[in-house]
Design a protein with these regions (language model features):
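N-terminal plastid-targeting presequences
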Residues: 23-56
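Short acidic capping loops at alpha-helix termini that bridge into adjacent secondary structure
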Residues: 185-188
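Positively charged, low-complexity, intrinsically disordered RNA-binding extensions
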Residues: 196-204
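C-terminal edge-of-domain segments
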Residues: 203-219
């Protein structure tokens, strides 16, 4: 190695050694800063107060839910409920309550529009009193909060995602039941169904899911 190359190599090594500790210290400092700024969350759940909802002209909420489905031959007693309507199928939903994904995501859409806690906080699955509960109970409570906050259903659009069973033969019954449950006109409730093209757990009929978007109008 020529003298010039040797000097350059020595300078590069010295520069690397000098900068490495500073880089490490800077990373550690940032890490400590993050740890130091962590805020401990309050584990005590405070029930929502409808009177504190800001009175906007309209509010929009989105809800999503998914439940695993198992064969009735493997888990007898399971059932498949959608929008408060029982569907005959060779599989049923595994859930703490009745596993009605449509009603569950409607609850989340309504409470989400109001800026309130989700269904898991309002009706926790570790509370035995909700074990096997029919989901219309949850919808009734969400509607109570909505009305006490001074709102009504303006429009609701639901999309059920399931490979089987076919939802189309049941859509009218589901829609009518939702309108009755929500105290809304059928014309503002829409129910759609999509398959998942045999992809992942939804497409393999091992789960069922639903999305709901709701528009709330100030009364």
């Amino acid at each position: 190695m020529c003298l010039t190359s040797a000097v350059a190599a020595a300078r590069l090594t010295a520069a690397s050694s000098a900068t490495a500790p500073r880089r490490t210290a800077r990373i550690a400092s940032n890490s400590n800063a993050r740890r130091g700024s962590t805020t401990r969350l309050n584990a005590v759940f405070t029930p929502p107060d409808p009177t504190k909802v800001k009175p906007l002209p309209v509010r929009i909420g989105h809800g999503f839910d998914l439940h695993r489905m198992e064969l009735l031959t493997e888990m007898p007693g399971l059932e498949l409920w959608l929008g408060g309507i029982k569907l005959e199928h060779d599989r049923g939903c595994v859930a703490h309550s009745d596993g009605d994904v449509l009603l569950h995501c409607i609850v989340d859409a309504i409470t989400g529009a109001l800026g309130m806690p989700d269904i898991g906080q309002l009706f926790p699955d570790n509370d035995p009193k909700w074990k096997g509960c029919t989901s219309d109970v949850f919808v009734t409570e969400a509607c109570r909060l909505m009305r006490e906050a001074g709102y009504e259903i303006g429009n609701m659009d639901c999309t059920i995602i399931a490979q089987r069973p076919k939802i189309s033969p049941h859509k009218d019954a589901i829609r009518a039941n939702l309108a009755k449950m929500l105290g809304a006109d059928e014309s503002v409730i829409n129910v759609k169904a999509k398959t998942h093209e045999k992809v992942d757990s939804l497409g393999e009929n091992r789960s069922i899911a639903c999305h709901t978007v709701v528009l709330l109008n100030k009364v």
